[in-house]
């Protein structure tokens, strides 16, 4: 398994979110690691769809609770399957993180299908890093709010 990691560049900033990236292109994978890591996220990147799926599956087990991912960003075709199949594989797990798919195909059907299976977005390559950051930040902001409401509800 080829795993690439980055941790927040400022060690005094506590880790808030973990991102799992699936990207076969080494240059794009390194770029995403650098940019999202510099934004303060812990990023784990995989070079193959098999490794991505295995890493995600392991992270969903209760004994690895601290290792769960908050968001998955993956090339839809790198997984060797339709993105819907990937999402379906994990639909029985309540803790599956949201997915953002990337693709070189400008296919409206692909986008509609991915969104119908729960993907937050389908971004076309070449990626606009500002668009990706907006989606990541928005998704993680909502996740943080939801967790805060759960904690407040449990204590109140």
Annotate each language-model stretch with its function:
Residues 85, 105-121:
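Alpha4 helix (beta4-alpha4-beta5 surface) of REC/receiver domains from two-component response regulators
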Residues 82-96:
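Short amphipathic alpha-helix used as the core "switch/output" element in two-component signaling
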Residues 125:
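A Lys-centered signature of the CheY-like receiver
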Residues 1-42, 50, 57-70, 88-92, ...:
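Non-catalytic signal-transmission and effector/linker regions of two-component phosphorelay proteins
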Residues 70-76:
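Active-site residues of response regulator receiver
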Residues 39, 95, 116-118:
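Short, structured coil segments at secondary-structure junctions
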Residues 101-102:
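Hydrophobic/aromatic residues positioned on beta-strands within the core alpha/beta folds
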């Amino acid at each position: 398994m080829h795993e690439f990691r980055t941790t927040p560049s400022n060690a005094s900033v506590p880790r808030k979110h973990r991102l799992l990236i699936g990207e076969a292109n080494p240059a794009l994978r390194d770029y995403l690691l650098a940019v999202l890591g510099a934004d303060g996220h812990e990023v784990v990147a995989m070079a193959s769809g098999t490794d991505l799926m295995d890493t995600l599956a392991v992270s969903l087990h209760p004994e690895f609770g601290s290792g769960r991912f908050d968001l998955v960003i993956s090339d839809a075709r790198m997984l060797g399957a339709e993105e819907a199949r990937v999402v379906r594989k994990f639909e029985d797990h309540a803790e599956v993180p949201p997915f953002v798919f990337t693709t070189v195909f400008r296919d409206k059907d692909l986008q509609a299908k991915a969104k119908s299976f729960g993907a937050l977005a389908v971004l076309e390559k070449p990626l606009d890093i500002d668009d990706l950051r907006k989606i990541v930040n928005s998704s993680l902001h909502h996740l943080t709010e939801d967790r805060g409401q759960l904690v407040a509800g449990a204590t109140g």
